[in-house]
Amino acid sequence: NRMGDKPDPDAVLSMTVCDPAMGSGAFLVEATRQLSDKLLEAWAAYPDKDPCKKLGADDRVFVAMRMVAQRCIYGVDRTPAAVDLAKMSMWLLTISKDHPFTFMDHSMKHGDALVGMSKEQIRKFHWDLSKGGSILPELRTLDREVEEAVQARLMLRNLDADRTLELEVTLAEADRKMMKAKQAGDLLVYIWFSQDRPKARNETRDRYTDKFTEALQPGSIERKEINEIRFAPKPLAPFHWDLEFPEVFACGGFTAFVGNPPFAGKNNVSKGNIRNYLDYLTSLVTPEASGRADLVGHFFYKAYGLIKPTGSLSLIATKTVRQGDTRESSLSLIVKKGGVIYDAKRRVAWPGKAAVVISVISITKLSLISLDIITSLIV
């Protein structure tokens, strides 16, 4: 328990937990329950920081859950219907019938957790930071815009869910600050996927530096195609983590990742996604990965890169995550970067009727145990 035996309420509410493929939000619902229990304990230990002293026990529970949901819980999914379902799950959990269904809009978002550009890639308008040239004039104010968005989104965390109009206005302002940068990131991803070879991608990118502003106009062909393909059967739905949740990365990253990311072998990844998707994963998400690695391995590697130096992740995977190409392309790479596998359940029967054997792997950036133990866990 990194918060200590008696964390104060501020410590509990400073935690950020994310599911990168949240589906219906089941893992985030459970995370909300557990963190709200911790928050109630913290209020009991620090009564001077308890905002609900006059409320009954049941009301205190629901206030705690709403505060945790609004401040600590984040989720992403590339299926729009799943995002709506997850929001509904949180809405029902917190008994927020008096609040709009959109009270989690700021932290539960549509997009592909594996596809997107960092702030630095967008600033240089290049996926390869070693090749990016001078910053485009249109992106020179990016740092200021991100900082302004951070401040607006921090206000969201502290606004009561009852203040519906103020929440909507503040979120709209934060989104407006990020709009140009997000559109630049979307365009960069669009350029990358539009070509099959590195040389053609670089040449196309160079052409767009001369017509950058034109390509971002609402009526441009590029904007139209980017918006259409975002919701296609095989979508390209970029998610630029630095820009979507800037307040999280202003604090170094997420406290934790949880979830059950999708499993898919090489052939299914290629068949089930837009052209060049597998190439993107092995070029930009996990550059040292084998093209034969299971999709779940890329989620492990991506999540590890998004947690703070004291953060951790615990994800469900198939047994392939500890075997062959998938292990070498995820767990082994994470360990080489200093990650510590502090718990590994190697063979767990999936509850219910499905004949599936899963692994549950928990990793932290903190140095807790020896490499000998790590090796024994992943073999």
Model-assigned labels for residue ranges:
Residues N1-V61, A82, E222-R223, N227, ...:
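Class I S-adenosyl-L-methionine
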Residues A11, K53-D58, H110-G111, V115, ...:
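Short, mixed-charge aromatic SLiMs
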Residues V29, S36, R78-E145, N158, ...:
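Signature of N6-adenine DNA methyltransferases within the class I
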Residues M65-V68:
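Short, flexible turn/loop "capping" segments at secondary-structure junctions
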Residues Y74-V76:
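Conserved SAM-binding motif I beta-strand of class I
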Residues D128-G253:
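Coupling/switch/interface segments within P-loop NTPase motor domains and analogous charged loops
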